[in-house]
Amino acid sequence: MKLKLAFLLCLAGLVVGAWAVSNQQSNGTLKIGDPVPSVMARDQDGKLVNLAEVAGSGYFLIYFYPKAFTPGCTAQACSLRDAYEELQNKGVKIVGVSLDTVDSQKKFQQAQRLPFELLSDRDKKVTGAFGVPLLLNGLAARQAYLFKDGKLIWMDTKASTDKQAQDVLAVLAQR
């Protein structure tokens, strides 16, 4: 009897957890056509970066990932790294954001040979400005936003890991 009760409680916990995570994937802040939020964070070198200035003109991709050095986040970053030249040829600037420390971002960038900036959002100002929800473990949800000339043209609130670059390239192919 105790085993059945424990099983049912675990099952109920999984169902509630899955429901909560799925409901957190929608973005309640940005809409297509909105400008890049003017918010600042430190990059992997400790330099203060204003996202609205980085975006400038042309295409700007900002992607959010839960935690450096985890399998899904590494696959997402490496997807963009591997397609970096093609994305650059299409004029796409890329910035990654997580709640990791500046030091962790630097180590992640170096270990994965990432040719783009990674921002440390310890105070959650960037995730807040973009409306990126926090997961049950307190980390930022995986999301991606593509801007053109400072205006949001596409968002992926359930961003892929190893297919992130292909998703962005597919959007660009339609334009």
State each model region's role.
Residues E53-T74, L80:
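Short active-site neighborhood of thiol/selenol oxidoreductases, capturing the structured segment around
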Residues A140-R175:
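Thiol-/selenol-based redox modules, centered on thioredoxin-like
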Residues D34-P35, L139-A141:
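Short, small/polar residue-rich loop motifs at catalytic or cofactor-binding pockets
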Residues E117-D121:
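Short acidic-hydrophobic, aromatic-tinged amphipathic segments that line or gate anion-handling sites
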Residues L5-F7, L14-S38:
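N-proximal helix/coil linker or "cap" segments that precede and/or mark the start of modular domains
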Residues F69, T74-Q112, K124-V126:
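Structural microenvironment flanking redox-active thiols in thiol-disulfide oxidoreductases
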Residues V39-Y59:
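A short beta-strand-turn-helix
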